[in-house]
Amino acid sequence: MKRIGVLTSGGDSPGMNAAIRAVVRKAIYHGVEVFGIYYGYAGLIAGKIKKLEVGDVGDIIHRGGTILYTARCPEFKTEEGQLKGIEQLKKHGIEGLVVIGGDGSYQGAKKLTEHGFPCVGVPGTIDNDIPGTDFTIGFDTALNTVIDAIDKIRDTATSHERTYVIEVMGRHAGDIALWSGLAGGAETILIPEADYDMNDVIARLKRGHERGKKHSIIIVAEGVGSGVEFGKKIQEATGFETRVTVLGHVQRGGSPTAFDRVLASRLGARAVELLLEGKGGRCVGIQNNQLVDHDIVEALANKHTVDQKMYLLSKELSI
């Protein structure tokens, strides 16, 4: 294999640039040309493809976002769109593709694989919801962003003796809510993977108040429901002064943590190795701090599950 491509797709995550850097430098080290595909699958279809040199990925390891940009692309879900993409890859002499992104990006890589084009998926999403890996690129950075917000909000919650509801990202996965809530000492954590009883939430808040607790922090994953509506219900049911903070897209930005930079470097380099070994149709990950790879079709057939023991621990510690 003499020429490979790399793209980022779907929602951006801190550390994507570190992964791009690793792909480019690893490939060039082995004498392979690398082409950056801009704006994800939409850019692939449109032929927004440019050769990348070592200098193009200098001074980016610490930067959030993605220098290749990203975009949603409904057209690539169609066979016609997929064939247009393959036509562009062949036009540029690209023989293998590294796809950095989340579940939707993996679905695109799977389709290319089914058309006979070698692809390797690299997990890049703050949601940490990709099967076959303990951690995804960007999760640790987003987690630290949320924890920083929790710590600051707790300061003002204490000063004003208020209850605060903090809504975090996670439409289908509760990892950000669970991990940040546990690390931030939240009194209640609500995630999409677990049912909750509003009466129980209110009863817990009242018990804490009776014990002399002057403030509370509640973490709500967006997939559970609106943090604003949740806050209204709590104030109406308890009479406690309640405020709501929706963290939103701040969770996707920022300079990646050391963990995410190292993770991205390891996974990006391993993706190139797999292509050079002739192993397309794979996705890379890290499990028990060891690099692993899986068949991308089999990986997508599985479902990411939240750590139930950690969830139970969070409930035990928030009495």
Swiss-Prot record:
It catalyses: beta-D-fructose 6-phosphate + ATP = beta-D-fructose 1,6-bisphosphate + ADP + H(+). This is ATP-dependent 6-phosphofructokinase. Belongs to the phosphofructokinase type A (PFKA) family. ATP-dependent PFK group I subfamily. Prokaryotic clade 'B1' sub-subfamily. One of its GO terms (biological process) is fructose 6-phosphate metabolic process. One of its GO terms (cellular component) is 6-phosphofructokinase complex. Catalyzes the phosphorylation of D-fructose 6-phosphate to fructose 1,6-bisphosphate by ATP, the first committing step of glycolysis. Homotetramer. CDD domains: Bacterial_PFK. It is found in: Cytoplasm. Its cofactor is Mg(2+). Gene3D superfamilies: 3.40.50.450, Phosphofructokinase domain (3.40.50.460). Pathway: Carbohydrate degradation; glycolysis; D-glyceraldehyde 3-phosphate and glycerone phosphate from D-glucose: step 3/4. It comes from Geobacillus sp. (strain WCH70). PANTHER family: ATP-DEPENDENT 6-PHOSPHOFRUCTOKINASE (PTHR13697:SF4), PHOSPHOFRUCTOKINASE (PTHR13697). GO terms for molecular function: 6-phosphofructokinase activity; AMP binding; ATP binding; fructose-6-phosphate binding; identical protein binding; metal ion binding; monosaccharide binding. The gene is pfkA. ATP binds at residues 11, 72-73, 102-105. The active site is at 127 (proton acceptor). ADP binds at residues 21-25, 154, 185-187, 211, 213-215. Allosterically activated by ADP and other diphosphonucleosides, and allosterically inhibited by phosphoenolpyruvate.
